[in-house]
Amino acid sequence: MEIEKTNRMNALFEFYAALLTDKQMNYIELYYADDYSLAEIAEESGVSRQAVYDNIKRTEKILEAYEMKLHMYSDYIVRSQIFDDILEKYTDDAFLQEKISILSSIDNRD
């Protein structure tokens, strides 16, 4: 499994997990976050390997569709870069540093 795809799916999952069914969440988490094989997930879930594969592929498309419509992940990346640029440029501005820290903590809430 390629690392870029794994990282992207994990990131999209963090943003959109609440919009998935329990089964979709479970399969994606086991496959991408916990590095289970399709066979291991199938055995644990009592379904065929093909059923797991189909569910994961369908869920990947769903996550990508959410991102295409909502842009939560891409906006987060842009926002983080802007915060980093501001923090780097204005290292002596305590007020600005504090406000950026507050905004960053909002982005990182669970």
Curated annotation (Swiss-Prot):
Family: Belongs to the UPF0122 family.
Cross-referenced PANTHER family: UPF0122 PROTEIN CBO2450/CLC_2298, UPF0122 PROTEIN YLXM
Main function: Might take part in the signal recognition particle (SRP) pathway. This is inferred from the conservation of its genetic proximity to ftsY/ffh. May be a regulatory protein.
UniProt protein name: UPF0122 protein SAG0983
Species this chain originates from: Streptococcus agalactiae serotype V (strain ATCC BAA-611 / 2603 V/R)
